[in-house]
């Protein structure tokens, strides 16, 4: 019974750490780039877009498809960075244990 109480306390402590980490992740931002920096997207580690920056040289009707592709690439670049940060933070909280969330 004593071991069970210890496990329960550990689980509660880990849950609190995960909640704290999730709140902290909302404040961390990453910036994705494409086209040599002509397109930039800033988003939170949780995936919320904070800003999109497009160099004025790309704002021509004939560049529309290129801009669309670059925006998508910049987003994917930022999302990849966000996923890496989330994985790193989760490892810090769980001590490297693989959890199903």
Curated annotation (Swiss-Prot):
InterPro entries: YbaB-like_sf (IPR036894), YbaB/EbfC (IPR004401). It comes from the Bacteria. Homodimer. Binds to DNA and alters its conformation. May be involved in regulation of gene expression, nucleoid organization and DNA protection. Belongs to the YbaB/EbfC family. GO terms for cellular component: bacterial nucleoid; cytosol. Pfam families: YbaB_DNA_bd (PF02575). Keywords: Cytoplasm, DNA-binding. It comes from Beijerinckia indica subsp. indica (strain ATCC 9039 / DSM 1715 / NCIMB 8712). One of its GO terms (molecular function) is DNA binding. It is found in: Cytoplasm, Nucleoid. This is Nucleoid-associated protein Bind_0255.
């Amino acid at each position: 019974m004593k071991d069970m109480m210890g496990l329960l306390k550990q689980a509660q402590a880990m849950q609190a750490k995960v909640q704290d980490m999730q709140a902290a992740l909302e404040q961390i931002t990453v910036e994705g780039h494409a086209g040599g920096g002509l397109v930039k997207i800033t988003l939170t580690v949780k995936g919320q877009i904070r800003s999109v920056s497009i160099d004025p040289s790309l704002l021509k009707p004939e560049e529309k498809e290129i801009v669309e592709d670059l925006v998508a690439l910049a987003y994917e670049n930022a999302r990849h960075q966000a996923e890496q940060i989330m994985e790193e933070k989760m490892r810090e909280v769980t001590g490297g244990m693989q959890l199903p969330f």
